[in-house]
Amino acid sequence: MKKLSFLLALLMTASLCRAQEELPVLSADRPGNTWGAEVLAFQKVSWENGFNFESAPDGTHSLTLNSTIVRYGIFKNMELRVGTDFMLLNNGRTPEHSLAVGPLTIGTKLKVYESTNWLPSIGLLAEFKSPHIGSKEQLPSHIAPSMYALFEHSITDWFGVSYNAGLVWDGETATPQTFLALALGFSITERLGTFIETYNYLHPDGNQYMTEFGLTWMVTRRLQLDLECDLDFQQFGKYYAIGGGVAWMIN
């Protein structure tokens, strides 16, 4: 599961920001698969960690024990990102599980425009997966880049919209997948929020249409907890993923 930024955090912490305007508030890159345009504040460090259980139609399943991303604000409008996954895999035919480490992912996000009136905030995200660092069976044959345009609207103080468009290479072929995502975020209270999103991978060999929904709890301005569930309505009842996690702005 990809780790995502979500404008829901901004909605839920708007009053906190007004009360403490000099203090930055965490805008987490999880949960969800739709990134927002916000970046981490200058010289701030965040650690985001989650778990995820995924069951596929072919009987295989995986448990992501630790899906980690570390973010660092290198400039006012730019952040550096490093992440990987630690997983238990099962082929669905035997009870044995194997431990695997996903490829190291390195990237950067740039905020290029701050929302004005009905115009959205705009960001750019570029990442690549290393073919050298991680478990051998999880590594791509070549560097696997991805790039995204990120858009984010705060419609009201309790409702927001994020949407993305991007290209994703798998490191095996020269033909990328097209990534399209749309997320709706709602503030239930000042600290509790919910979201629903659709995220889709389009490829000549076949498309994948996914839906995710979940809850977020902004414990403090620097700490967020979340729960989420993914469904594939093309294979309803055969595929699902459930997970949760924490995002923490360390300094």
Regions found by a protein language model. Give the residues of each.
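Transmembrane beta-barrel domains of Gram-negative outer membranes and organellar outer membranes
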Residues: Q20-N251
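Sec/Tat signal peptide C-region and signal peptidase I cleavage site
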Residues: S15-A19
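Sec-dependent N-terminal signal peptides
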Residues: L4-T13
